[in-house]
């Protein structure tokens, strides 16, 4: 199991990817403790001096001008958590909640939120005991932060709400007991500090990023397999072509194809002097299209790594100056736009894959048997598998519509512009599943096409990719129940089996 000492503000994408995939044991860097204590002391000083400061002794949103009496401050913190836990729909996965909790811990531990160490440690203990609050997926507009999801997360700290432990749903009170904790009475500012922030949106977006990385790798491998199966030319991957255009990601994508389609391929050698001048765009323009997708992935990764290490609370406590300042770091517009760009990349990866698969089943273009099966007519082969791929590609086109351009005012127009980051990021999982399904169909089709080129072999990496599939799915010699083949190919892609065939340091979370 991964052991991770949190150095606040220094989480890497590689670490975040690991936490998104498996349980973790967290600890807090002792050097972070003084800053946490100092910010909490500033809040205590505000209360002792009787000053009025938003989020500490006032109402929230439109009620920000309502001062709360000292005897009601503890009730205020509990009330904000319980009243804001108003999400709806299916529950987030344990993986998403674990990542969200890590992001919240990382943000609070930077020492700008005025929250006590014991609250942060309680979140750490829940994660370490693999106790994950039950958090509905829907109910956040991404400003003022992810209020509803983070409120559901926080109810467990109060001994309220529900959590999941070993696959079973238990009460928040029982969850705290299992973690060896007593329910927490939140001090002034702490309820708001827990609820304000972009951690739900960012967790969804990071998961989408990691899915996009895996899809990019698999699509590149499947695309190279399709080049071989269709007897496509290698000349479009010549580094000189991409160097004169100048896009770094296009050059990197072309390098990946050359890495896969090396000169040892017998299939490539067999038609090196053929008369065919140009391949269809779905083969020839792969570096250009996939390079553009890689640019979106890298750009989103840069934004999300910053956001994962950010302080998105409000108000913020600057202990060195004794100041508490209201701002808008909770507005998740950067996350929303990054997620929108990832959606474009995921959709285009799938769209290009579907076109390559359609090319392979077209005997006029690929010079392979119609629908990749012998005895056509009696056998329909990959005919309807391509229809499935087309349906998934079309669905992704609708899902790729930008969410960040939408906004609905909330909280009686006090919060009059919102980011919709949570939906922007949440839909990436569905889009990823669609694109993975398309790639599964292409993977099957490309391997089938390569088998028809026997006894000629491709390059070692392409042959390894083909063999990985053939260990699970045999050659399609005649019509059989097709769905299990797609499911098996899909399962392999979900395991990211192609990542090891790609060049190192290509994708952001590899660094």
From Swiss-Prot:
Alphabetical keyword list: Cytoplasm, Histidine metabolism, Lyase
InterPro entries, per database record: Aromatic_Lyase (IPR001106), Fumarase/histidase_N (IPR024083), HutH (IPR005921), L-Aspartase-like (IPR008948), Phe/His_NH3-lyase_AS (IPR022313)
An example Gene Ontology molecular-function term: histidine ammonia-lyase activity
GO annotation terms (biological process): L-histidine catabolic process; L-histidine catabolic process to glutamate and formamide; L-histidine catabolic process to glutamate and formate
Signal peptide segment: none
Cross-link (5-imidazolinone (Ala-Gly)): 143-145
Modification(s) after translation: Contains an active site 4-methylidene-imidazol-5-one (MIO), which is formed autocatalytically by cyclization and dehydration of residues Ala-Ser-Gly.
Enzyme Commission code: 4.3.1.3
Location in the cell: Cytoplasm
Family: Belongs to the PAL/histidase family.
Name of protein: Histidine ammonia-lyase
Organism, as annotated: Vibrio cholerae serotype O1 (strain ATCC 39315 / El Tor Inaba N16961)
Gene designation: hutH
